[in-house]
C-alpha cells in the first residue's frame, strides 16, 4: 500500500505509521482481524480489535480509491488533457470527494447549455471574459454574431453558460462552498403529500430547522427517510448572495477585478453558476456527507447492541422445555436435550378461547418429569405474560428455573433455509420454539443463524449504507464467536463459519470430517480436513476448543505455535504441562521475561500465562431469572409515577427501549437517565440489562410510554 494511504490511516486513527503498515502486511498475508489482535500484538503494538478493524476498513477504502484513480487517469489521458501536474494532484488524493472534484471537468456528461454554446463557437469569448482579458464584453461579443449566434445578447448568454459550468466544475470553488454549507442549517417543509396517517410520524419535522453540524444521527436519518417517502422537502439554508460574493471575491483575488461592463456579465455568470449548478450539487454533497457520518454512528450503535445480544449470558448445557406462546393457535412446546437436540414437541391450549388449563398443567408436569427438564424458556411475544403466569401454577421440581427469552428474529429463522435444513420434517412453529430454547442455552450459537438485521436492535437500520452495515455486523459476529471460542466437536457449521480463517465451505468440511471419523481428539487433526491447509490452520486453531483432549492446551486459547513455550514453562517448574494448565499457584511463579524472544514478546507471554490460569474461560456472565410486575398486564394499567422492573431491549442514540412486561416497550429518553443534560445511552445501559424505571408519561392514543431510569 502506498505511503500516502498508510500515513492517512495513521492520522485518522491516531496510531503510528508502522502499526498500520504491519496490519496491512498481515491482511495481505491472509490474516484475520481476530487473529491479528489476539496473536500478533508485537507486530501491531498491541492494537485492539476495534483499531485493527478500522485499519482493515480504511485499507479497503483506499484500495478501491486506487482503482478509481486508475480509471480517472485513463479517462483524462484519453481526452488528451493529462498533465504531470494533474497526475500529481490525483496521485496525492486521500479523499474521494477531492478526486471526483478534480475529475469533474473531464467527466463525460450529458448535453448542457454550455455544450451548445461551445458548439456555437463561443468558448474563445468565454475564455477572454473568464481570464479578464477584455474590457468591453459587448464589443467582443459582436465578433461572434453570425450563422450560429443570432445576437450579441445570445453570444454573451452562451459565454456566461460556459463560465457558469466551468465555475461549477472548479475543485477550489466547490470545496469553498462545501465548507460554508457544512456550517449552515438543514431546513424541512411538509409537502402536499404529507396529509395522511403515514406522514404523521414525521409531524415534528413538518417545519423544522437544525444546525447540520449538531443534528443527531437519528433525526437526520428520519428526515431523509421522510424526504424519500415524499412527505418532506429538504434543503440547506444558505445566503445565495453571500455565497456568490465569496466565490466572486476569490476569483478576482486570483486574477484582477474586471471593469464595470465585464463585471456585470461576470456577476450574472456567477449568480447563475451558484443557483442553477452549484447550490443543488453542493447541497447534495454535504447532505450525503452528513448522512455518511450518521450511518457510521448508527452502525456503531447497531454493532454494540449486537455484541451485547450475542454475548448474552447462556444457561449452558441444560435440558430445556421451550414454549412459543399463543392464544387461539395454542402454545407450541418443545423439549431439548443438553446439546439442543429435539426430543419432543406438542401444542397446549391454556389460554382463551380453548382454555384447557388443567390439561395443559398436566402436560407440562409430565414433560418436565419425563425428560428431566432443568430450565423453561418462554418466548416474550404474544401471550408471554399469560404463559408465564400459567407456568407458575405448575408444581415444578425444585431447582427448575423459568426464563423469558426474546423472540426477535425467531420467525425469520423458522422460515429460513437453515431451519428447513435442520428440521425438514417440522413446521415453522416447532422450529421457532426450538430456536427460543436454544437461545437460552447458548445465545451466540443460535443467533449466528439469523440475519442480524432481523434481531430488532438497530437504529434506522434500513436507511443506512448496507455495505457499511454488513461489514460492521460481520466483524461483530466474528469478534464475538472468536472471543468466546468454539467447541470443535459440537459446533454447527453456521457457528464454525465465523471462526477466524474458516468460512462456510471449510466449516462444512470440518463437520463432514467429524461425521465420518468421530470426534476430534486434537487440533492437529484439523489438518486432515479437506482443503484446510497450513494458513487456515494458523488462523483458526487458537479459537477452537476440544474438551477432554489429550493435550489440555487444545481446550484453551493458547495457540499451537506457542505450545513449546508452555512446555518449557512446565519443565522449568518441574511439572508436566497437564499439571501446569489451570494451576493458578504454579502459573503465578512463572517469570514472564524469561520466555521473551525475538519472535515472541511480553504481551504474548502475559496472554499465555493468563490463559493457563483459566484455560478456555467463557467471557460471558451467568444467566439470571427475572420477573415483571404482576399487576401490570396492558398499557391501560399504567399510571405516571409507577416504579417498575424492566429489561433493556434496544439502545439508540436518543434513548433506550425497555420491556416492562406488556405489548408496548417504554422509552427512557437520553434526558431521563439520571445524569445532567443528554446522556449517551450506550455508556449507561447494556442490552438485556435489568433496570428499575419510573413511568413519566403514558400516551394511550399513540401507545407510547415514557420512562425514567432509577439508580
Spans of model-derived segments:
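C-terminal accessory/binding modules appended to enzymatic or scaffolding proteins
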Residues: 15, 313-315, 478-512, 630-674
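Accessory alpha-helical DNA-binding modules that contact the DNA backbone or grooves
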Residues: 32-33, 44, 48-115, 120-146, ...
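Duplex nucleic acid-engaging cores and interfaces of nucleic-acid transaction enzymes
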Residues: 51-54, 61, 65-322, 328-414, ...
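Long, charge-rich intrinsically disordered scaffolds of nucleic-acid metabolism proteins
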Residues: 98, 403, 409, 414-484, ...
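Low-complexity, acidic/Ser/Thr- and charged residue-rich accessory regions of DNA metabolism proteins
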Residues: 143-144, 148-152, 208-209, 246-256, ...
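A glycine-rich phosphate-binding loop feature that marks nucleotide/adenosyl-phosphate handling sites
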Residues: 179-186, 323-327, 381-386, 405-412, ...
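Long, charged amphipathic helices and adjacent flexible linkers at domain junctions
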Residues: 285-303, 454-487, 595-640
Amino acid at each position: 500500500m502506498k505511503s500516502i494511504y498508510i500515513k492517512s490511516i495513521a492520522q485518522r486513527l491516531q496510531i503510528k505509521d508502522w502499526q498500520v503498515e504491519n496490519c496491512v502486511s498481515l491482511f495481505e498475508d491472509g490474516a484475520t482481524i481476530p487473529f491479528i489482535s489476539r496473536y500478533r500484538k508485537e507486530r501491531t503494538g498491541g492494537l485492539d480489535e476495534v483499531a485493527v478493524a478500522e485499519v482493515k476498513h480504511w485499507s479497503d477504502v483506499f484500495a478501491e480509491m486506487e482503482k478509481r484513480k486508475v480509471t480517472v487517469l485513463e479517462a483524462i489521458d484519453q481526452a488528451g488533457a493529462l498533465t504531470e501536474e494533474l497526475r500529481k494532484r490525483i496521485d496525492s488524493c486521500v479523499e474521494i470527494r477531492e478526486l471526483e472534484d478534480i475529475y469533474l471537468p473531464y467527466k463525460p456528461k450529458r448535453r448542457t447549455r454550455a455544450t451548445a454554446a461551445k458548439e456555437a463557437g463561443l468558448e474563445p469569448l468565454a475564455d477572454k471574459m473568464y481570464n479578464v482579458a477584455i474590457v468591453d464584453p459587448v464589443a467582443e461579443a459582436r465578433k461572434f454574431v453570425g450563422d450560429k449566434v443570432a445576437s450579441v445578447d445570445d453570444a454573451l448568454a452562451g459565454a456566461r453558460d460556459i463560465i457558469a459550468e466551468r465555475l461549477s466544475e472548479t475543485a477550489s470553488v466547490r470545496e469553498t462552498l462545501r465548507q460554508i454549507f457544512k456550517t449552515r442549517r438543514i431546513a424541512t417543509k411538509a409537502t402536499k403529500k404529507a396529509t395522511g396517517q403515514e406522514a404523521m410520524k414525521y409531524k415534528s419535522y413538518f417545519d423544522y430547522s437544525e444546525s447540520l453540524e449538531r443534528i443527531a444521527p437519528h433525526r437526520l436519518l428520519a428526515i431523509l427517510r421522510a424526504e424519500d417517502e415524499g412527505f418532506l422537502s429538504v434543503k440547506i439554508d444558505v445566503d445565495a448572495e453571500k455565497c456568490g460574493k465569496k466565490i466572486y471575491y476569490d476569483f478576482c483575488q486570483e486574477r484582477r477585478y474586471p471593469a464595470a461592463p465585464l463585471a456585470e456579465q461576470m456577476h450574472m455568470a456567477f449568480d447563475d453558476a451558484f443557483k442553477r449548478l452549484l447550490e443543488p450539487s453542493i447541497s447534495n454533497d454535504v447532505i450525503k456527507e452528513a448522512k455518511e457520518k450518521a450511518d457510521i454512528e448508527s452502525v456503531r450503535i447497531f454493532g454494540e447492541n449486537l455484541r451485547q445480544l450475542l454475548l448474552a449470558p447462556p444457561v449452558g448445557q441444560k435440558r430445556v422445555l421451550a414454549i412459543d406462546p399463543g392464544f387461539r393457535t395454542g402454545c407450541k412446546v418443545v423439549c431439548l436435550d443438553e446439546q439442543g437436540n429435539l426430543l419432543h414437541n406438542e401444542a397446549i391450549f391454556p389460554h382463551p378461547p380453548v382454555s384447557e388449563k388443567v390439561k395443559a398443567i398436566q402436560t407440562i408436569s409430565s414433560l418436565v418429569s419425563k425428560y428431566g427438564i432443568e430450565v423453561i424458556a418462554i418466548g416474550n411475544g404474544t401471550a408471554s405474560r399469560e404463559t408465564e403466569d400459567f407456568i407458575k401454577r405448575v408444581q415444578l421440581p425444585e431447582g427448575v428455573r423459568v426464563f423469558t427469552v426474546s423472540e426477535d428474529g425467531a420467525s425469520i429463522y423458522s422460515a429460513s433455509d437453515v431451519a428447513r435444513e435442520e428440521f425438514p420434517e417440522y413446521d415453522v412453529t416447532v422450529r421457532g420454539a426450538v430456536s427460543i430454547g436454544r437461545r437460552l442455552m447458548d445465545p451466540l450459537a443460535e443467533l449466528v443463524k439469523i440475519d442480524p438485521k432481523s434481531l430488532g436492535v438497530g437504529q434506522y437500520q434500513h436507511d443506512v449504507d448496507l455495505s457499511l452495515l454488513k461489514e460492521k455486523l460481520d466483524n461483530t459476529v466474528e469478534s464475538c464467536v472468536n472471543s468466546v471460542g468454539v467447541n470443535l466437536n459440537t459446533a454447527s457449521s453456521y457457528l464454525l463459519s465465523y471462526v477466524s480463517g474458516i468460512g462456510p465451505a471449510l466449516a462444512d468440511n470440518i463437520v463432514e470430517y467429524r461425521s465420518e471419523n468421530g470426534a476430534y481428539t486434537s487440533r492437529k487433526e484439523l489438518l486432515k480436513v479437506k482443503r484446510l491447509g497450513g494458513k487456515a490452520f494458523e488462523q483458526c486453531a487458537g479459537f477452537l476448543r476440544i474438551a477432554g483432549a489429550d493435550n489440555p492446551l487444545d481446550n484453551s486459547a493458547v495457540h499451537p505455535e506457542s505450545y513449546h513455550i508452555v512446555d518449557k514453562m512446565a519443565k522449568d517448574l518441574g511439572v508436566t504441562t497437564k499439571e501446569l494448565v489451570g494451576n493458578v499457584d504454579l502459573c503465578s511463579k512463572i517469570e514472564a521475561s524469561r520466555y521473551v524472544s525475538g519472535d515472541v514478546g511480553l504481551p504474548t507471554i502475559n496472554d499465555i500465562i493468563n490463559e493457563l490460569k483459566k484455560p478456555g474461560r467463557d467471557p460471558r456472565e451467568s444467566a439470571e431469572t427475572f420477573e415483571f410486575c404482576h399487576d401490570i398486564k396492558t398499557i391501560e394499567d399504567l399510571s405516571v409515577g409507577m416504579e417498575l422492573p424492566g429489561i433493556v431491549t434496544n439502545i439508540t442514540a436518543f434513548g433506550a427501549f425497555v420491556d416492562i412486561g406488556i405489548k408496548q416497550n417504554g422509552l427512557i429518553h437520553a434526558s431521563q437517565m439520571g445524569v445532567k443534560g443528554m446522556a449517551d445511552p450506550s455508556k449507561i445501559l447494556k442490552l438485556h440489562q435489568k433496570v428499575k424505571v419510573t413511568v413519566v408519561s403514558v400516551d394511550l392514543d399513540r401507545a407510547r410510554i415514557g420512562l425514567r431510569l432509577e439508580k
